[in-house]
Amino acid sequence: SSWKEMCELWTSDLRTHITEKRWHKAKKQLGASLKRHNISNGFGKSYLQSGKYDSLAEAVGQYGDAMVEIDNDGILLRISTNKIQMNLNLRRGMTIQKLAFASHDMVPCIGTLPHGYFSCISLGADYYSGGVVIELPIERRRITDLEQVNPHFLLKNNGDIQIHTIITSPVGEIIKSIEISSSNESISLNYHFSKWSEINGSIRLGNITLLNDFSQEGVKVLCSNGGIDEECFILNNEVQQIASPSTLVSSFGGLGATTGDISIANKHKKLRLSWEPSECSVMPLLQFSPSNSRALSRVFFSMTEMDDTKKYSANMGSFSLSISTGIEN
């Protein structure tokens, strides 16, 4: 039956007890099953839209329902609507400097924490949001998207604004776009990896650094881990899912989040992070590091991790992350 075949193709033996011959046989069986059920085996799509893209100079000023501004140094790009205020750092790969929603009284909930924010030496770094980090432990290399970018803008038919850029890295192009809703408290971060080489390491993207009330002890993280109901995790102790236990294993573990939703809530406010698992089955990772009266609170999304059973993919695919308050018109 179809259910039996699905379970056979989902067996952990194809990951932990595998030979080259059996691996190719399983791939052939999977291809035949997809064809029989008329399911495409295509993986990864570009989130860029057709239409005329405008340059930064053309977009500055009133752009649709938004106001687009650039600072005197040409570094910080500010996009403002009635419901959203967002600053992007064009010198650091279009990472999010700060993001605020109207229902949060425009107090930033996500953004960048600069070096020196924490007095603890172990946390002495810049912590960005919306970036890509590729760790290659065997090569002892780290690749990021923190490069100077030249964004282009598209005003969609529904009034939403898309900002996109292409970043060249040693392993391939990172095609990155950010879409701002004109009607809801929602943005989306979209990533597409074109013609990438094989990665012997980890790829973490859509990295979120929480600010203000969302970065304090007692914040709740809610998600489903295979069941119907959400599980609730209260951040009050050190959490380091991003840490690497050895050079052969890149992470201790992560969240299941099987529905493609994570909610982050404090006493009065809520954030919703959502994605489509059928398009990209990322693994969310949490980091919570208390430091005196402050805390570093971050959520990462892993497209691939590394251990001694890793199989390489010829296509890295795409990922789209929606960030919202869950409030819609």
Feature-to-residue mapping (PLM):
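Extended, charge-rich low-complexity regions and/or helical-solenoid scaffolds
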Residues: 83, 115-156, 177, 206-237, ...
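A short, sequence-level motif marking secondary-structure junctions
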Residues: 90-95, 115, 179-184, 277-281
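Broad, structure-driven detector of short, well-ordered beta-strand segments within folded domains
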Residues: 77, 83-92, 174-180, 271-275
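Histidine-centered catalytic/metal-binding microenvironments
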Residues: 1-97, 103-126
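Acidic (Asp/Glu-rich), glycine- and aromatic
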Residues: 93, 100-102, 169-177, 181-233, ...
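Extended, loop-rich substrate-binding clefts of extracytoplasmic carbohydrate-active enzymes
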Residues: 128-196, 290-295
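Beta-strand-rich recognition/accessory modules
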Residues: 157-158, 162-170, 186, 196, ...
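A short, compositionally biased
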Residues: 71-75, 91-95, 158-159, 227, ...
